[in-house]
Amino acid sequence: MYALALFASLLATALTSPVQDPKTCSGGSAVLCRDVKTAVDCGAVKHCQQMVWSKPTAKSLPCDICKTVVTEAGNLLKDNATQEEILHYLEKTCEWIHDSSLSASCKEVVDSYLPVILDMIKGEMSNPGEVCSALNLCQSLQEYLAEQNQKQLESNKIPEVDMARVVAPFMSNIPLLLYPQDHPRSQPQPKANEDVCQDCMKLVSDVQTAVKTNSSFIQGFVDHVKEDCDRLGPGVSDICKNYVDQYSEVCVQMLMHMQDQQPKEICVLAGFCNEVKRVPMKTLVPATETIKNILPALEMMDPYEQNLVQAHNVILCQTCQFVMNKFSELIVNNATEELLVKGLSNACALLPDPARTKCQEVVGTFGPSLLDIFIHEVNPSSLCGVIGLCAARPELVEALEQPAPAIVSALLKEPTPPKQPAQPKQSALPAHVPPQKNGGFCEVCKKLVLYLEHNLEKNSTKEEILAALEKGCSFLPDPYQKQCDDFVAEYEPLLLEILVEVMDPGFVCSKIGVCPSAYKLLLGTEKCVWGPSYWCQNMETAARCNAVDHCKRHVWN
């Protein structure tokens, strides 16, 4: 409401100013566009908007007030206020003017030219200076500079502002003359005032706090500097804003870099504080102790290097054993060969990726020939070792070079557990352990289960375990977090089923197949155990492997 009152007062003042020869409209833009009243009387409103009023304006108090009032009037129009309501409010505000003649003139202007003014406000909301130029409250910047140059030409006196600009470069070089910069920085610098040093440290500390706690501080700081540029006067303010736009990004980067630096150090570099001669050395703490303090639930690696099998081979082994067990169940039920392959394909679909893909590869490669092998009641786990997807038993190494009956006999024997060689003692590994290659999840599985074991109570429900799984990865160090998220996304259903019963890291991770056996014995070189992909290459290999009938029925048909 106060803005409208001020707006009406400015209208009265502007539109009652005299115009040279108002009866004629042949005086050019200087006369036509002097104010809105003359432009309306001569029908030159559009011409003045395009050619005169849209030009940059000089800075002045009436112009700034007018721009503010025009902006407020535009906001009032956005609030869906009708023209009659605005007219009524403006007429009421005209009555508040103490000068009776100005009050009457205000009402006359409001009644006569309000529609034209409101149309201009609606059309030029982004440039309120155009409306204020029409009201003769803002002066063209070009006209203002021309008047200043004319005044300077009419007088022989050198303006004071020019003298200051001439002297400024010489004054700025005086500190360099008094304190040459060629000396090494190790020499003591002039003592700075303690009060100035304290003020600098407080300012830097406040800025650092604002940068850390207020995300909009940087943009607000730049906007505040631009507002200060407006106080420098016409011409110079535009140059100031140009410098701000050009160098503000560099200043922001410096502020972000200094947010973790000590205020005293920054003020020393700026010359407001005395240079610190000595800085006490921080006490070094072993990395293992630092990590334990940050993550109490995270245990370090064992003091010896584990020779782990890649998780890629573990997935193949677990998939093969799953397929073989399903195959045995189907054979017991006297299923046909077509149903066997179809049933195995359906079983593969139940596995998570990438085990699903590997399972389909096993079925596609060995499925048609598995029936012949299972006739001899071969152990599924042993067969997976023969075809190279699981660790082979020692007694199979020699048998693989023998004919097929010898291979079957070796497969039917009970497996004997291999002796584990003693682990050589080595120095402790560093605290930072990179993730395994090929997407291995063994280490991250152990650390995640260990975290759950330390932070969950016994007999925890599935919901509690699931909640702990979803946030547990965020407590691991950075090298493990992404790998942990992938691990949980892939093994979450299987993990839940096992963790409800037991939370031993070694058992759980071995149970789901991400931590394989540390040793894998080499297989023999007998190619006939490679399966149909080798048997059915040609008639010669099929005959040598006694698989001619199989290749004719399943591959060559």
Swiss-Prot record:
Any Pfam family the entry gives: SapB_1
Gene Ontology molecular-function annotations: G protein-coupled receptor binding; identical protein binding; lipid antigen binding; protease binding
Residues spanning the signal sequence: 1-16
Transmembrane residue ranges: none
Compartments (UniProt record): Lysosome
Disulfides per UniProt: C63-C138, C66-C132, C94-C106, C197-C273, C200-C267, C229-C240, C317-C390, C320-C384, C348-C359, C442-C515, C445-C509, C473-C484
Gene3D superfamilies: Saposin-like (1.10.225.10)
One Gene Ontology term, aspect cellular component: mitochondrion
UniProt keyword list: Disulfide bond, Glycoprotein, Lysosome, Repeat, Secreted, Signal
Every Saposin B-type domain range: 59-142, 193-277, 313-394, 438-519
Propeptide: 17-59, 143-193, 277-312, 393-437, 520-557
PROSITE patterns: SAP_A, SAP_B
Residues bearing carbohydrate: N80, N214, N334, N459
Gene Ontology BP terms: adenylate cyclase-inhibiting G protein-coupled receptor signaling pathway; antigen processing and presentation; cellular response to reactive oxygen species; ceramide metabolic process; cerebellar Purkinje cell differentiation; cochlea development; corneocyte development; cornified envelope assembly
Domain Saposin A-type: 18-58, 521-557
Function in brief: Saposin-A and saposin-C stimulate the hydrolysis of glucosylceramide by beta-glucosylceramidase (EC 3.2.1.45) and galactosylceramide by beta-galactosylceramidase (EC 3.2.1.46). Saposin-C apparently acts by combining with the enzyme and acidic lipid to form an activated complex, rather than by solubilizing the substrate.
PANTHER family attached to this UniProt entry: BCDNA.GH08312, SAPOSIN-RELATED
Name this polypeptide is given: Prosaposin
Species of origin: Mus musculus (Mouse)
Gene label: Psap
